[in-house]
Every structure is written in C-alpha cells, then in structure tokens.
From Swiss-Prot:
Record-given protein name: Probable metal-nicotianamine transporter YSL17
Region of interest called Disordered, as start-end residue ranges on this chain: 1-36
Entry keyword Transport: yes
Subcellular locations according to the entry: Membrane
UniProt topology in membrane: Multi-pass membrane protein
Cellular component, GO, one term: membrane
Statement: the UniProt record of this protein carries the keyword Kinase: no
Species the sequence originates in: Oryza sativa subsp. japonica (Rice)
PANTHER family: METAL-NICOTIANAMINE TRANSPORTER YSL17-RELATED (PTHR31645:SF48), OLIGOPEPTIDE TRANSPORTER YGL114W-RELATED (PTHR31645)
Coiled coil ranges: none
Tissue specificity comment: Expressed at low levels in roots.
Gene transcribed to yield this protein: YSL17
Length: 698
C-alpha cells in the first residue's frame, strides 16, 4: 500500500497485483497498449468540423422541441453516437482518396460529444422557450398586469447573443475547482455521463479484448431493443392519457397520485447504476410528499391558496412543492459546504502544528457512502493519473469567474435596464451556491433542477425590483443568469465524468466545452430568430403547433411575484420546518458514518428525499424496478456477469431510450399521428363507457 501525489491530490494505491476477477472486469486493460493522444491529436480539424455540423443540426431539433413541447430527450448519447459515425465517414472518405489521417480515438469522440451537447443544450438553458420569449409583447398581451412599459422587452437577436455570451461561461468556471472532489474523492455517479462514457468506450474497444467485445455485444443488444421500445409505444399513444407509459401499476388511486411504472427504460437504467440508498431515499421522499403532504395541502385549497389555479402556478400547490424541496436541498448543500470547510481548516491546523501525516478526513457527502476509498483497481489508478495530470490552477478559475461577473455587472444592465448593477452582483454571488447544490444532486440522482433554481431567482428579483421598475423583465433576466450558470455547471461536471472514464484530458474537455458553448451562443439565437419571425411564438392565435407553452408560464410566475408576495400561506413555515429536518438528517448521517453505526444503512439520503419532492413518483418507481432487477441478477442469476456487464446493460437502457425518444419526437415534428389509443380506466368508468357506446349504436 502506497500513496502517490498527483497534481496536489493524494491518491492511495495498492501496489499488490489485482486479483483475477478485477483484471477480467477491467476496461482500461483493453486500451493499455494504446498511447494517450496529446491535446493537438484530440482537438483536430476533423473534430471541429464534425462538432460544428452536428451542433447546428442537433440544435435545430432541440429548438423545435423546446418551442413546441418544452421537452428534450437526452442528447449526450445521440451526440456521441452520431459523432462516432460521422468521424468514421470522414476517415473512409480520406482513405478512398488516399489522404493520411490521425487515428480516431475515444478521446476525440468524447470531445465531439462534449462540444455538441454544450452547443445544443443552450436551446433550453438559453431560455428561448421560457424567459426570453416570456419578455415579449406577444406573451404579455394576454394579461392585464405588466403588459406594457418597462415590463416588456421584445427579443432582439443582437441582445440575446450578447446576453448568452455573458452568462453561459460563468458556470464552467464555478465547477472547475470542484472536479477532483466530486469525481475522484467522492465518486459521484453522474449516471448520464457514465452511460455516455461506456458507450464511447465500447465503440473504440480493441478487437483483441474478449471481455470488451462481450460488453460491446451486450450494450448493442440492450441498445437495439431499447431504441425500438419508445417507437413501439408511440403507435399506441394516439390521444390524451393514452399509451403504455400511463399503465396504472398499483391501481387507479395510486395512479392519480403519480405512483405507477411508466415503462421508461431510462429510469430503469439509472436505478441499476445509482446506489440502492438513493433509490430507497427517493421512494421514501415520494411517499412523504406525493402520498401524504401534497394531498393534505390540496385539501386546504381556498384557505391556504386560491382555488382553480393552474397546476404550475407557484401561488398554489406548486409553490409548496418547489419551496419545500429547495429548502431541503439548500440545507443539505450548505451542511456539506460547512463540513468541508471545517475539515479543511482542521487539516491545515494539523499541518501547521508539524504533523507528519494528515489522516484523510471522512468527506461530508452522505448520498454515496462517500468515504475516500482505496484505489485498488488498475482502472481507478489509470483514470486518476490522467484526470489529475492536466490540472487547472484554482486561482485561474476563480479569477475568470470574478472577471465574468464584473463584466456582467456592467454589461447586463445595458442590455436589460430593469436589472440594476446590485441585482446582477447579487445573482452572481448566489450562483455558486446553487451551482454546487445542483451539481451534487445531478451527480447522485441525474436530476437537473436548474429551472427550479431559476424560478426561485425570478420570484426574488421580481419582488425586489417591483412592478414600476420593470420587475417582470428583471425577474426573467435574473432567471436567465441563474439557469445558465447552474445548468452549465452540472452539464460540465457530467462531461468531466465522461472524460474521466474515457481518459480524456481535462484541458481538452474545457476546450470542447468552451468551443461548443461559443457556437451555441451564436447558432441557437439564429435558429430561434427564424422560428420567431416565421411563426407566431409566445402568443395565441397561431396554428396551434407554434405556441411556446412555457413562455406564458414563466411570465405568469414573474407577474405573480410582482403583483403580490407570491408565496402561498404557510409555505415559509413549512420551508423552515423541512430545512431543519434536512439539517438533522444530514447531521445524523454524518455522525453515523463517523462512528460506523449500523444504523447508517437505514438513514435516508437528504438529497434523494429532497429531489423526490419535485419529480413525479413514477421516476423513483422506475428506478426501484432497475434496482430490483440488479439485485435479482446479482443474487440469483450471475454475480460475475452482473459485475462485468452492468455498465453495458444500463448504458444501453439509458442510451436506447434517448435515441428512441428522439425518433418518436421526429415523428411528432413531421405531424404524424399515432393510429391507436390504449387507455386504462376503472371498472366503473368502463361500465359508463359501455353504456354510452350502446346508446350510440342503438
């Protein structure tokens, strides 16, 4: 047993040889004979061309989906897959004409995937279907409050591009100093990033590795079957509440509360990758919130909050869901930060006292059994060596964020005068805290809550500025600052996980992220501008397919925040209560882990419980199905095979669902309509339906 210092990071390694099982299940053994490409061999003209073409094409699809449905399938896996095939086509073309070329490596494939995803996700985080369109007069014309004057700002392509360049790079520099802590020390899962990495590794596995070929075959079997499943489901979703995805697994009463299995293979795959404690915690949180708390609060309609409000109105039941869940996430995140600061201070104090060895502190992350593990496998040592080799100075990241914040404090009020300099400064002070909490949650549960943090910022800044000062536009613009920073941070950390598992240089990842973000800040506004001019976006009177549904919702939240305090009755009290409970739960897990209590396995994860307050219960149910399938596979089928093939199977489930959803979305974009409707009704409703049909036939 020995310690190696790499890039200032202490990594514990085992000098003994790995046992036969660990060697057999090693991914990096298959690539051991391949030299690692340099930065110049990763960032090539080929990767730049493929990234540019794919980024633009995928952005068109993402923008169209954003402006019509507000939904977006996972783009990471399709980007990696399409990048692989386009690069192969490029190579074949060069071979035909006899031009020499560099080998296409998994590191270059990862770079393409990072650039394409960072470009296309700006279609959503850029707010084209939400806060930017919500500022327009088309969205305001339907309302009677704040529909003119300083509370309306028509979209302008030049202003939008400038705003995106100011706010979209800040999230990258927030998260860079935390990459070692989250990826190396605490081993956060980042399920989507892990799935993408296994997919890319499978594409580039050397032919001599028998085990790798088995993983590739398994992955493509899982992928192929899963791709067809969403397309098959589409044929039976020919109406509202139709299709297999609304199967009332536990009965109609549970279905109405959201407790059912929706046959989403993405959730099943995530459940197979995530630790069982996370899945159990999310199930517990769903039962407490969706099974007990929200039904009770709904009985208070008319007293605690107005009746007949829209389901997404933060002045109603949605307000309790958002604020109570956010209070728990903030409590756990702040506890984690404070614990890390205390442990760091203690370690520094011991060093100053001349201690020869500083015992590694137990990290404060509760969700993942995050105690620093001994890096015993060849894969762990190899990946850590590459990941820590090209390190970024922390002061450079901090200075870059400070410079971007200072530039935004000056420039954003010129673009949106409703936001003052102090408002922008306050947003940039709060953004790192939100970004850390969100990246932590994404690493554990794969749930990105950046839009939720943006809504919180929208309400705060709208109330701060007020109606007369243009609080509606101010809140929407502040939402953009927070969403861009928070979403960019979590997306980049997902990419760090992908790069860690594919031995991609962190510097190459930063280049790909910056290049893709810069491209997205230009391409997406141009695409949006075409849609905005050609179609009737943001207002009524269109052809029905061109109305952005979330633009009015976001503007309604801002108007609600300006016109009244915005918070439903007793929500602040509930937030305080659950904030205290979350702190107590985090402290209990910390004490139990420090003292190695057996009760630790029964104390739920705070972040898992909190996320369940937002997401529908069908997601934890799907994850539980995946966790149960993995348990049966390990205990009753083949433990060795489960250890070897689990990443491939889970990746195929997640990736295939993303590709299949993209294909079914394309059918929707082509205005194709499913021919069949499968609907589940109760026995009494079926009797009424039969009676009605009998009268029609008579």
């Amino acid at each position: 047993m020995a310690e190696e210092a790499r890039g200032g990071q202490r990594v514990v390694v085992d000098d003994d040889r790995e046992d036969a099982s660990s060697v057999a299940s090693s991914t990096e053994r298959a690539f051991e004979g391949e030299p690692l490409p340099s930065l110049g061999e990763t960032v090539t003209a080929r990767s730049a061309a493929v990234s540019g073409v794919l980024g633009a094409v995928v952005s068109v699809v993402a923008m169209r989906l954003n402006l019509t449905s507000g939904l977006l399938p996972s783009l990471g896996v399709p980007a990696g897959l399409l990048g692989f095939f386009l690069a192969r086509v490029w190579i074949r073309a060069l071979d035909v004409v006899g031009v020499s070329h560099l080998p296409f490596t998994r590191q270059e494939n990862t770079l393409i995937q990072i650039a394409v995803v960072s470009c296309s996700t700006i279609a959503f985080s850029g707010g084209f279907g939400t806060y930017i369109l919500g500022m327009s007069g088309k969205s305001a014309n339907e309302g009677h409050i704040g529909s003119h004057g300083r509370n309306v700002e028509e979209p302008n392509i030049g202003r939008v591009i400038a705003f995106l360049f100011l706010v979209n790079f800040s999230g990258l520099f927030i998260i860079v100093p935390l990459r070692k802590m989250m990826i190396i020390r605490h081993r956060l899962t980042f399920p989507s990033g892990t799935a993408t990495a296994h997919l890319i590794n499978s594409f580039h596995t050397p032919h001599g590795a028998k085990q790798a070929r088995l993983q590739v075959v398994t992955l493509f079997k899982s992928l192929g079957a899963t791709v067809l499943w969403p397309i098959f489901q589409w044929f039976f979703a020919g109406g509202k509440n139709c299709g297999f995805q609304i199967f009332p697994t536990f009965g109609m009463a549970a279905y109405r509360r959201g407790f059912y299995f929706d046959f989403s293979t993405t959730n099943v795959g995530i459940g197979m990758i995530c630790p069982p404690m996370i899945t159990a915690s999310m199930l517990a949180g769903s039962i407490v919130s969706w099974g007990i708390l929200w039904p009770y609060i709904e009985t208070k309609a008319g007293r605690w909050f107005p009746e007949n409000l829209d389901a997404n109105d933060l002045g109603g039941i949605m307000g309790y869901r958002v604020f109570v869940g956010v209070s728990m996430i903030l409590a756990d995140g702040l506890f984690t930060i404070l614990s890390a600061l205390v442990r760091t201070a203690c370690a520094m104090r011991k060093r100053r006292r001349g201690a020869s060895t500083v015992t590694a502190a137990v990290p404060p992350f509760q969700c993942l059994s995050a105690t620093e593990r001994t890096m015993q496998s060849f894969d762990d040592r190899r990946r850590a060596q590459v990941f820590l080799r090209d390190s970024f100075p922390t002061w450079v990241a901090v200075a870059s964020y400070a410079a971007l914040a200072a530039l935004s404090v000056v420039a954003v009020p010129l673009l949106y005068p409703q936001l003052g300099h102090r408002h922008v400064a306050a947003a940039y002070v709060a953004a790192p805290v939100f970004a850390f909490c969100n990246a932590y949650g994404v690493g554990v549960t794969d749930m990105n809550l950046s839009a939720t943090y943006g809504k919180i910022a929208m309400m705060v800044f709208s109330s701060w500025v007020g109606m007369d000062g243009g609080g509606v536009v101010a809140g929407l613009a502040a939402c953009g600052i927070i969403v861009s920073a928070v979403s960019g941070s979590s997306d980049f950390m997902q990419d760090f996980k992908t790069g860690y598992l594919t031995l991609t240089s962190p510097r190459a990842m930063l280049v790909g992220q910056v290049a893709g973000t810069a491209l997205g800040c230009v391409v997406n506004p141009a695409i949006f501008w075409v849609f905005y001019k050609v179609y009737n976006m943001g207002g009524g009177g269109g052809d029905g397919a061109d109305v952005a549904p979330y633009a009015r919702a976001y503007r309604g939240i801002a108007v609600l925040s300006v016109g009244r305090h915005g918070l439903p009755d007793h929500s602040v009290l509930l937030c305080k209560l659950f904030f205290a409970m979350a702190l107590a739960l985090s402290a209990a897990r910390e004490v139990a882990e420090r003292r190695r209590w057996r009760a630790l396995r029964y104390i739920p994860s705070t972040i898992g419980v909190a996320v369940a307050f937002f997401v529908p219960p069908r997601i934890p149910v799907g994850m539980a199905v995946g966790c149960l399938a993995l348990h049966v596979w390990r205990r009753h089928v083949d433990a060795g095979g489960a250890r070897l093939l689990l990443p491939a199977v889970a990746s195929g489930l997640i990736c295939g669902d993303g590709l299949g959803s993209l294909a079914s979305s394309m059918l929707t974009l082509l205005r194709a309509r499913p021919p069949i409707c499968i609907k589940f009704v109760s026995r009494f409703e079926n009797q009424k339906l039969d009676a009605f049909l009998a009268t029609r036939h008579a």
